[in-house]
Amino acid sequence: MKSDKPFLERYFYTPTLLQKGLIFALYPFSLIYQCIATFKRKTAKKHDFKIPIISVGNLIAGGSGKTPFILEIAPRYQEVAIISRGYQRNSKGLVVVSVKGKILVSQNTAGDEAYLLALNLKQASVIVSEKRELGILKALELGSKIVFLDDGFRFNFNQFNLLLKPKVPPYYPFCLPSGLYRESIKSYKEAHLVITEDKDYKRITSTTHPTKRMLLVTAIANPSRLNAFLPKEVVKKIYFKDHAPFNLKLLEKEFHKNNATSLLVTSKDLVKLQDCKLPLSVLDLRLEIDPKVLEKIDNYIFSYPYNTKEHL
């Protein structure tokens, strides 16, 4: 736990001269990583499930707004399934998190992102599975007519590939470990649709239950991206690793040490604080998406003969 910008975020976005030397020393490994990732995707067995599958992904490791994007577009349709890996869950294999809004498992079993989706998407079913093809088959079994696949670009499915592109890219366009990309930056050209922040969508934030002295506590990737949206009443920022669980005793200690009047958390972090007795303020994030983007997604979905606006 630390309250300054995490090392990896500095390394990938604002590297020092010494870090730049390390980046170029590791570059041969990045080329190997890039070749393996691209080879695996292009040679993977092709699957066609005869159902519209919208993959919401990114080329950059870590958060880029995939969950808020799905939260924004999924409610526009009925008979929807959301399929995710279920990061940092304490379960393995395929787990049905919710069926049409009825939540079946705990946050720990589902993972924070999947549980957040289940809480907010009352018309959708949420499934987590390391093997996405099994998740899609389960969605079909549940009667879903549309699938939103979280982070599915690397899978060779017959799907609509949508890639989110951040407003601020990493310092170098390299793959891991020299950069933050999981595939070559040229892979953007292979997507059906590339959605760029502040061009095709904008982040809109509001604070629920604000107080005079808020202590920001978050466990998301690249947490400094929240800075532009934080209220002036934030007295300190405490960052945990992405998806990390919160230690409630540590939070209580920091709360009193900083004379805070509430913890400020994101909606994603809130699902992990159900047992927290401290006052909570919530930084709500939603996306305003260009209607042209929504129209392109609609056109793909309605290209399937049994999907019509009357039915969905």
Curated annotation (Swiss-Prot):
* Species this protein is from: Helicobacter acinonychis (strain Sheeba)
The molecular function GO annotations come to: ATP binding; tetraacyldisaccharide 4'-kinase activity
Give me the reactions it catalyses. a lipid A disaccharide + ATP = a lipid IVA + ADP + H(+)
- Please provide the Gene Ontology terms (biological process) for this protein: lipid A biosynthetic process; lipopolysaccharide core region biosynthetic process
Residues bound to ATP: I60, A61, G62, G63, S64, G65, K66, T67
Gene Ontology cellular component terms for the protein in this record? plasma membrane
Q: What is the lineage of its organism?
A: Bacteria, Pseudomonadati, Campylobacterota, Epsilonproteobacteria, Campylobacterales
Its protein name is Tetraacyldisaccharide 4'-kinase
EC number(s) from the headed UniProt entry: 2.7.1.130
Q: What class of enzyme is it?
A: transferase
- Keyword set includes Ligase: no
Q: Which family does it belong to?
A: Belongs to the LpxK family.
Keywords linked to the UniProt accession: ATP-binding, Kinase, Lipid A biosynthesis, Lipid biosynthesis, Lipid metabolism, Nucleotide-binding, Transferase
> Domain of life, per the record?
Bacteria
InterPro entries assigned: LpxK
Function per UniProt: Transfers the gamma-phosphate of ATP to the 4'-position of a tetraacyldisaccharide 1-phosphate intermediate (termed DS-1-P) to form tetraacyldisaccharide 1,4'-bis-phosphate (lipid IVA).
Question: One Pfam family of this protein, by short name?
Answer: LpxK
Q: In which pathway does it act?
A: Glycolipid biosynthesis; lipid IV(A) biosynthesis; lipid IV(A) from (3R)-3-hydroxytetradecanoyl-[acyl-carrier-protein] and UDP-N-acetyl-alpha-D-glucosamine: step 6/6
Q: Which gene encodes it?
A: lpxK
